């Protein structure tokens, strides 16, 4: 009986842990990847600098614990909490 109870506890822990993983696009050319523990927000930011008219906007994607603060050189900033929501 103790063995069965222990097995159920282990299965529950494994299932709960799997339920909290997030997958996000990490770079524009990659397939979605699992985010590190504690980073359950996907983000995508597009920013320009003084060379934007020559090389285009810089796109950064990934996983974060908190959404980055919007800055004046960002063209856009997306933060979301569902899998693969930052293509």
From Swiss-Prot:
Subcellular location: Secreted
Disulphides: 24-42, 35-63, 48-52, 67-79, 80-85
Tissue-specific expression: Expressed by the venom gland.
InterPro entries named among the record's database cross-references: Snake_3FTx, Snake_toxin-like_sf, Snake_toxin_con_site, Toxin_cobra-type
Major subcellular location class: secreted
CC annotations in GO: extracellular region
An annotated Gene Ontology molecular function: acetylcholine receptor inhibitor activity
Cleaved signal peptide residues: 1-21
Keyword Disulfide bond: yes
Recorded superkingdom: Eukaryota
Keyword Transferase among record annotations: no
SUPFAM superfamilies: Snake toxin-like
UniProt record similarity statement: Belongs to the three-finger toxin family. Long-chain subfamily. Kappa-neurotoxin sub-subfamily.
Task of the protein: Postsynaptic neurotoxin that binds and inhibits neuronal nicotinic acetylcholine receptors (nAChR) with high affinity (IC(50)<100 nM). Is a selective, and slowly reversible antagonist of alpha-3/CHRNA3-containing and some alpha-4/CHRNA4-containing AChRs.
Description of how the protein assembles with itself and partners: Homo- and heterodimer; non-covalently linked.
Protein name (Swiss-Prot/TrEMBL): Kappa-6-bungarotoxin
Species of the source: Bungarus multicinctus
């Amino acid at each position: 009986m103790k063995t069965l109870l222990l097995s159920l506890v282990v299965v529950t822990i494994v299932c709960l842990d799997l339920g909290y993983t997030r997958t996000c696009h990490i770079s524009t050319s990659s397939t979605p990847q699992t985010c590190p523990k504690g980073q359950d927000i996907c983000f995508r930011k597009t920013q320009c600098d003084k060379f934007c008219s020559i090389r285009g906007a810089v796109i950064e994607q990934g996983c974060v614990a908190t959404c980055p603060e919007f800055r004046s050189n960002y063209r856009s900033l997306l933060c979301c909490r569902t899998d693969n929501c930052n293509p």
